[in-house]
């Protein structure tokens, strides 16, 4: 797939579009970034696909979102990353899987991330343990 702009919505009360623009392709990993004008504060999304030696297809999506604040040292204001969140999603398919099967697997994962599915939402958003 051609590396291109990727627009992702957040979950604010009024969702914001986050536009990631192509930055680079290195070792078959495409990278798009949400540019803030300061590279240290850029959110990054990467996507890759590789075929393993045993014929499986593995695709990985990664989202890296830093939180940046201004810091003043000796009267000089500079941006500094105060924390970073990471999400990694791995897909691992048998070479005999069909397009329909793969599409359904992706749909189930996308559906699992809906805010009204409390098991997943409470675990990954509210940081509640599974009991």
Swiss-Prot record:
<dbReference type="InterPro" id="IPR015954">
    <property type="entry name" value="Phage_RNA-type_capsid"/>
</dbReference>
<dbReference type="Pfam" id="PF01819">
    <property type="entry name" value="Levi_coat"/>
</dbReference>
<keyword id="KW-1142">T=3 icosahedral capsid protein</keyword>
<protein>
    <recommendedName>
        <fullName>Capsid protein</fullName>
    </recommendedName>
</protein>
<feature type="binding site">
    <location>
        <position position="2"/>
    </location>
    <ligand>
        <name>Ca(2+)</name>
    </ligand>
</feature>
<dbReference type="GO" id="GO:0003723">
    <property type="term" value="F:RNA binding"/>
</dbReference>
<dbReference type="GO" id="GO:0039617">
    <property type="term" value="C:T=3 icosahedral viral capsid"/>
</dbReference>
<comment type="similarity">
    <text>Belongs to the Leviviricetes capsid protein family.</text>
</comment>
<feature type="binding site">
    <location>
        <position position="131"/>
    </location>
    <ligand>
        <name>Ca(2+)</name>
    </ligand>
</feature>
<comment type="subunit">
    <text>Homodimer. The capsid proteins form dimers that assemble by group of 5. Twelve such pentamers are linked together with free dimers. The homodimers binds to the viral RNA via an operator hairpin, but also to many other RNA sequences in the viral genome; this interaction probably shifts the virus from the replicative to the assembly phase and ensures specific encapsidation of the viral genome.</text>
</comment>
<comment type="function">
    <text>Acts as a translational repressor of viral replicase synthesis late in infection. This latter function is the result of capsid protein interaction with an RNA hairpin which contains the replicase ribosome-binding site.</text>
</comment>
<dbReference type="InterPro" id="IPR002703">
    <property type="entry name" value="Levivir_coat"/>
</dbReference>
<dbReference type="GO" id="GO:0005198">
    <property type="term" value="F:structural molecule activity"/>
</dbReference>
<keyword id="KW-0946">Virion</keyword>
<comment type="function">
    <text>Capsid protein self-assembles to form an icosahedral capsid with a T=3 symmetry, about 26 nm in diameter, and consisting of 89 capsid proteins dimers (178 capsid proteins). Involved in viral genome encapsidation through the interaction between a capsid protein dimer and the multiple packaging signals present in the RNA genome. The capsid also contains 1 copy of the A2 maturation protein.</text>
</comment>
<keyword id="KW-0694">RNA-binding</keyword>
<keyword id="KW-0167">Capsid protein</keyword>
């Amino acid at each position: 797939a051609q590396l291109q702009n990727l627009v992702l919505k957040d979950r604010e009360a009024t969702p914001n579009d986050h536009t990631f623009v192509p930055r680079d392709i290195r070792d078959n990993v495409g990278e798009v970034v949400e540019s803030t004008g300061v590279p240290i504060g850029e959110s990054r999304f990467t996507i890759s696909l590789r075929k393993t030696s045993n014929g499986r297809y593995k695709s990985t999506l990664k989202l890296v979102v830093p939180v940046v604040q201004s810091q003043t040292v000796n009267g000089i204001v500079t941006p500094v990353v105060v924390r970073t969140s990471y999400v990694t999603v791995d897909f691992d398919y048998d070479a005999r899987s069909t397009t329909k099967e793969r599409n359904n697997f992706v749909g189930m994962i996308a559906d699992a991330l809906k805010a009204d599915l409390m098991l997943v939402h409470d675990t990954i958003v509210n940081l509640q343990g599974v009991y």
